[in-house]
Amino acid sequence: MINSNDRQSTLVVAMSGGVDSSVVAGILCEQGYNVIGITLQLYDHGMATAKKNACCAGQDIYDAKMVANKLGMPHYVLDYESKFKESVIDNFVDSYLRGETPLPCVQCNKSVKFRDLIKTAKELGADKLVTGHYVRKINGDNGPELHMGLDPLKDQSYFLFATTKEQLEYLDFPLGALTKDETRKLASKFGLEVADKPDSQDICFVPDGNYKNVINKIRPNASESGKILHINGFELGTHSGIINYTIGQRRGLGISYHEPLYVIKIDPNSNIVYVGPESALNVQEFVIKDVNWLAGSLKDGEKLEVSVKVRSTRPPRLAEISKLEGDRMKVKFLSEEKAVAPGQACVIYDGTRVLGGGWITRDVIPA
């Protein structure tokens, strides 16, 4: 499973305390590698540290340590709270204040889990950093390629689009060809107590799923009231802060109208939430920024037919991308898509291969 024939290689496993990374550690120990487990303490929000479906907090650190003891491997806990707050939590909060829908898991993988943890692994003399993500690393003609996991229900490639070529060289993902059931069976085989542990939540640092409390704690003036306008220009009511809204939202708008209304646009500068009929959510094209490209090079103006995902839970859609100046791309759907939200990621695929991706901007053109 690991691209190394040297059983004397030292491999660092990023251990969250969950079943996936624990099984990775078990696989590598069984194969005879020198394995070091590292768990990152990322936050401490009271209730969240004791939740069974959180990650990288109190109970999970204990679980990771117990797994390491069971497997007879060294294990270290690193305090990354300040790095995590700076790179992930602050970005999450500020994204909502910009009227965006943030994606903290990508930011965490991009910065803390890969950039910072790879640096630590190299300082320990490790040959690879190995994680429990459900993606595949396949050696292509021009180097390693990032591919979807074989299990479509667990594929995590959308969340790893920002992985750089250099990071991909150093990473390995042994679970990419497995299903979750197969992973749990391996956990039972290794005698790991986490075999039946529930999966972690998407936003690990938000207690009880109430992200607004996190935002208001860090930015006390975040919930500033403002107008709710119909896209045709007339006022329908007031809101208690743009952080309470996301593109495509229908429920909880706090207004009444003779037809269902959806959030179409959020303007942070004027503090206005625009609503309209479902048809107004249709998008034909948009621009992405901070593009990470893993497949060769593209010239400005060059076009390519691909498939793209604009939400992790949506299937890929056929689209045409064209390279813009700098690190931006234009994405044009071959058939319109709904509710393309600024702040989310657009991940670009060729079949199962991740070609790259970027962050959706406000440059969204309705259908």
From Swiss-Prot:
Q: Which GO terms describe its cellular component?
A: cytoplasm
Assign the protein's first listed, main location to one coarse class.
cytoplasm
- In the UniProt entry, which residues are flagged as the active site? 108, 204
Which residues form each disulfide bond in the chain? 108-204
Fetch the InterPro entries from UniProt.
MnmA-like, MnmA-like_C, MnmA-like_central, MnmA-like_central_sf, Rossmann-like_a/b/a_fold
- Identification of the protein by name: tRNA-specific 2-thiouridylase MnmA
* Enzyme class, spelled out: transferase
Q: Where is the signal peptide?
A: none
Name the domain of life: Bacteria
Q: Name one GO biological process term.
A: tRNA wobble position uridine thiolation
Per the entry, what this protein does is: Catalyzes the 2-thiolation of uridine at the wobble position (U34) of tRNA, leading to the formation of s(2)U34.
For this UniProt record, the keywords arranged alphabetically read as follows: ATP-binding, Cytoplasm, Disulfide bond, Nucleotide-binding, RNA-binding, Transferase, tRNA processing, tRNA-binding
Q: Which organism is it from?
A: Rickettsia bellii (strain OSU 85-389)
| Residues involved in ATP binding | 14-21, 40, 132
Region feature (Interaction with tRNA): 154-156
What family is this? Belongs to the MnmA/TRMU family.
- Look up the EC number in the record and give it: 2.8.1.13
